[in-house]
């Protein structure tokens, strides 16, 4: 009996081990593809986010360069905002023009997105920076001169004729007519059919001799063929009219080359001196949990 019990126990242990092994292998076959798929999706998402950040950074840099390269003189201070001329960079505002006031044209169609670039190599660590300077007072805001309104353009051509309107409502009924009299006589009826031929009459007597008379001119004949072309006529008198009306406005020309940089402005006034910085303190000791204790009794993490 003891041997049978041991055999049953060994069989139970063997079956249990085989069962757990099969379950473990099946679990590995199921979980490995799921983990691989999850990691692949996370990798794709991170790659997409990195490309989006690169494209956004590239767009921001391009806009910064456009703003930096935009023509204009922004070095004037408030006292020069309303000047009408002068030497250096201040002379551009005295022409009375309105080049910067007109609205720009509609934006062009967006270009196709470029291919993502290859990731660059990590740069070398930079050298430690110099100690910062004290804060300077904010610059006085520059008041921009008001723009002169552009003159109104000529009236446009007349539009096409509109569609016909809907039919109007029915009119009111007319007043009743009075008693009518007899109408006018109708037109004569058509001629009746020809009658039968009559009996031949008796022969007549000899007639009187006819008088010879000269007939009048006949009707004019048809027009003959056109004759040869005559010699060229003399030049006409010069016209008295003025020049014709101006033609339509042509298409806008290509963008011109950027103008030369203006003369540098004068040096600005010195700013107010900044306040004194806080007194530096050294940490007294550092705690194990990351806190730092200073001599004044404060603690920072």
Curated annotation (Swiss-Prot):
Residues 105-134, 153-176, 183-212, 215-282 are annotated as: Triple-helical region. One of its GO terms (cellular component) is collagen trimer. Pfam families: Col_cuticle_N. Residues 143-170, 179-191, 219-229 have a biased composition (Pro residues). It comes from the Eukaryota. Nematode cuticles are composed largely of collagen-like proteins. The cuticle functions both as an exoskeleton and as a barrier to protect the worm from its environment. This is Cuticle collagen 2. The lineage of its organism: Eukaryota, Metazoa, Ecdysozoa, Nematoda, Chromadorea. The gene is col-2.
